[in-house]
Amino acid sequence: MSFQLTLECADSGGALDSPRDPKRRRATLAAALQILLIAMLIVLGTSSCFDRQKKTSTSTTREVVDEAGRHVQLATHIDRIVSLAPNLTEIVYAVGAGEHLVGDTEYCDYPAAAKNVAKIGDTIHPSIERIMALKPQVVLVSTASQLEAFTKQLDEQKIAVYVTNPRSLEEVFRSIETLGDLFGHHDGAASLVTDMRARSFTVEVAMRSVRPVRVFYQVSGEPLYTIGRESYLTDLVRRAGGTSVTADVPGAFPRYSDEAALAARPEAIILPSGGSMGTANSTPAAALKNSPAVLNNRVYKINDDHLSRPGPRLIDGLEEMARALHPGAFK
C-alpha cells in the first residue's frame, strides 16, 4: 500500500471530491488521513504478530502434553535422554535416537547397545543423584513402574519428565510416533509403526475365522496377579484370538484371588516367562491346576520381554500368542 498515493489522491481533487468545494475537500482529506492511520495500525499489528511467531519458532523450549495429561516443557532439540523403563529404551533405539540415550536402568538390556549406557539403578529405585549428574533434557517414565513419587522429585529438580501410559496396541503405536517426533526422528518412528501395523494386520486377518479362546494371563503365580481392563495386554489377548477372563477387573495388573481364578475356568493360560525373567513364572498357580487349560494341556509360555515391554517387540508377542492359541490359523 502507498501512503503517498492516498494523500495525493485526496489532495488533488480527483473523483473523490471537487477542488472548488473547501468543505468537501477537508472532509475527504480527513477521511484519507483516517485510512492512513488504520493502514499503519494494520501494518504495525502484522509486524508485531510476525515478531511473536518468530520468537516462538526460535524458542529453545516447547510445551507438550504427555500420556498422563501433564504439561511438560521440553527442549526444542533433545540430545540427552534418560530412560527409566526397558520398553522406552527399546523405543529410543528403534526410532533412531539411541545416540542420545545417556542413562537407563539395570533392566534395560535390549538392544545390546543399551547394556553399555550409564546405569541409574533399577526401575523402581533409580538414583536421583545419578540422573542429575547425567544432565538429561528429558527423563522417560512408564507408569507401569509406579514412579509417581519419583516423578514429583524430578519435577522439583526442574528435570523434564515425560510419562507414557499406553492401554492398547494402538496407543503403543501412538507412543512410538510421539516419541519419534519429540526426538526429531519422525521418519524412523513412522517406518517402524508402519511395519508393526502390517504385522498386526496379518494376525487380524488370520483371526477372523477363529472362535475366541477364554484366556487367563498369569503375571505372577505366588502371589497371583493378572491383567485387568486398563492393561494393554487385555487388548493384545483379544487381538490374538482370545478373551481375557479378567477383562472386566479394575486396574492394569490387579491381585487376583485363588477363588476367582478357580471359578474363571480358562481354556488357555498364558505364562510370560523366559527372557529377562529367567525361569520365574513358568508354572500355573495352584488355584488353576484343575482348570480346563491345565487339564487339556493348553498352558503356553511366551517370552516375557515380548509381552511386558510395550514397545517395538510387542508385535513379536502378539504373533507368538496368536500362534499358540490358534496354530491352525497360520498354516
Regions found by a protein language model. Name each.
Residues 34-45:
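Bacterial N-terminal signal peptides
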Residues 50-52:
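Bacterial signal peptide processing site
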Residues 61, 80-145, 150, 245, ...:
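A short, structured surface patch at a secondary-structure boundary
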Residues 70-71, 137-138, 148-225, 246-248, ...:
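Extracytoplasmic substrate-binding proteins
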Residues 85, 143-144, 219, 249, ...:
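Short secondary-structure boundary segments
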Residues 128-135, 157, 256-265:
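Short helices/loops that flank or line small-molecule/ion binding pockets
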